[in-house]
């Protein structure tokens, strides 16, 4: 490997810049491994400048009519370099309209001398005029003819998420497009499940990045808890909400190591596991991003923190990754005896599994189980259900001319993987194209059966419609003439209804749960859930007594003009029941007094005495100690 980069082996958390040749650019996984061998991962961020002869797309003059369904106005509050950010949904608009808005006097980039001057203006402008971000648009602008570093076909081990579990999460294992303007911001965060990410700036003004080295990530978390105590109390992993902005000045004053780098059009930025990053756009631009994984990530994924309030929880089972790529520790991990320690300093690859042969080992196990072989995903991607606004195809049709790839003979493999623990076994992947969809998974198949495409958990549950396509057909982006752009952006449709989800790799103790809510749609209880063994019971051993002098407040919701109940303002307090075995227990609106017939027995007199002294709530708890609604009154006991 003779690739040129801008600094020697990284020992000081410097953000490295790499200049691969066209030959080196051909193998994405190999080049990422080379970058880590040079210490690029220690900074948490690296830049890759592709060869001059490489192009992601020949031209971008045919994307003006792509629809941005949900533009987000970024409103900030705070002072002294510490701000919180929230989003207001705006009316849908075309990319051409968004470009015109971004270049208008109200939103255009202010005059500046250089990047450093613009950076100072950025932090001084908060709160200021809130910009509008065209973020999280499911789709890709890479042409099918682009084989190297095509974000829709990276071919990393993250493909196992769909191949083994049948799970597609938009923005995680499918690309997202981002149309930005001056001051649009991505707040401090790590990637979902602490994955890698790659960001390509297709065209437009630069993007400035800040990053904290992974080995100092916990220091940033401690500082954030001090600066945002309210958010921290509400959620242990509140940084995953992407609402916290902390300026470089504040980081310096608190001794948090960080680096900055400016990305320009035609350049890639790679973030590494547990690398906290943030940044802003200098003006109108278009970027594309997706997550990916390497064997080194698996240990990070095992211990990745999660949003505890459920607002930004994106998680999936690590079973397939550990079982296939770390078979020597699978049994220990399955019984929660695998004491994983993440080494932020040195890249680690399991000795028994090299990155280059994981696809062959999957094929070997499938062949041993008597299933049809899986088409190699380096040259062919699975068929998925997609939304109408997905991957761009200006001509509106046509089949993908993706060459096939024969699976290599595996008789010389040194070991055979254990069979899948999933209820329906491993999925058969087939089909071509670049299907993208917010939470729409390629349907898993059993041998010899044909099923409809399933919808799996969405990354943020903001999809407004579903569609499907025949195998070999390109999905379509939604254009302005296909929707009414003068209407407000649609809100979430509410709780998703899961159809059949065979092929899921949930823990075995979750697989038989049921029955389904809809008898006409038999379904598994949801994709890739953790085992019930890991769920700690929160029921107290003794139910506290509530004396009659304590007033128990009940939650009352107001009605609208139509007489319907209004939703609570804080939607985070509403428990979203995503799975068929969950049911909502209604809170009673009043307490019924228990009547006791006259009885001369000592037991009856004792019951009457307790009823008078401690009230009906205590009696209800005695009758049924596990009844859930009296437990809601515990906080009122003083």
Curated annotation (Swiss-Prot):
Question: What sequence ranges are listed for the domain JmjC?
Answer: 143-309
Enzyme Commission identifier(s): 1.14.11.66
Q: Mind telling me which GO cellular component terms the entry cites?
A: chromatin; nucleus
Name the coenzymes or cofactors required.
Fe(2+)
Q: Name one Pfam family in it.
A: JmjN
Q: Where is the composition biased (Basic residues)?
A: 431-443
Q: Where does 2-oxoglutarate bind?
A: 133, 199, 207, 242
Q: Where does Zn(2+) bind?
A: 235, 241, 307, 309
Q: What does this protein do?
A: Probable histone demethylase that specifically demethylates 'Lys-9' of histone H3, thereby playing a central role in histone code.
| Full protein name | Probable lysine-specific demethylase 4F
| Source organism of this protein record | Homo sapiens
